[in-house]
Amino acid sequence: RTNSTNIILDRNSPEIELIYEVQGKRIIDPRFDRGEKCYAALVNESIVSYIWSSRGSVGVDEINMAVKPSTDEAYLYDAFTIEKWRGNNLYPSILQLALENAEKENLKRTLIFVESNNTASRRGVSKAGFEQFQTLYYKRFLFFPSTKLSTPIKNHNSAKFIALK
């Protein structure tokens, strides 16, 4: 088991420089300006795994749409674990931290989307306690994208998607 520490980063975090080292200010500052948070795993005072959380719309280039969480939801996106540290349960542990924090903030649901062929991420999401409630089908024919959402499982509202700006 890896000796790691999990932290929550926002604009006022003393450890803010750690995420700048990983992704750079050009990407991070607009996220913090929107009030987003970063959940991260540290090993030897360096970020080795992270995921971002947003309460507002976030563009998803892969599907040419944006996820729009409801006012009582958060959306987790842009996850990454450095290859050397994969397989150490860092991803599920930061996902659990995000879920715990969402509960403290009285959010009803935390959304995360994983490509069906990403077995490792699907396993991590499951380990963290997420439940698959809906499937998004995406196809592209020539230059024409097509998306379809399955009906959500019982007692769940559908996820919301909007056009990219």
Regions inferred by a protein language model and the residue ranges of each:
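Conserved hydrophobic beta-strand within the GNAT/NAT acetyltransferase core sheet
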Residues: T110-V114
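Conserved N-terminal entry element of GNAT/NAT acetyltransferase domains
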Residues: R1-S13
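Conserved catalytic-core motifs of GNAT/GCN5-like acyltransferases
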Residues: E131-P145
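Conserved active-site alpha-helix within GNAT-family acetyltransferase domains
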Residues: S116-Q134
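Conserved acyl-donor/pantetheine-binding loop and adjacent beta-alpha core of acyl/acetyltransferases
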Residues: R26-P30, R34-C38, L42-A74, D78
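Conserved acetyl-CoA-binding loop-helix of GNAT-fold acetyltransferases
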Residues: D78-T81, G87-K104, R109, R123-K127
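Conserved GNAT-fold acetyl-CoA-binding loop/helix
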Residues: R11-G24
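Residue-level recognition of the GNAT/N-acetyltransferase active site
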Residues: I82, E115
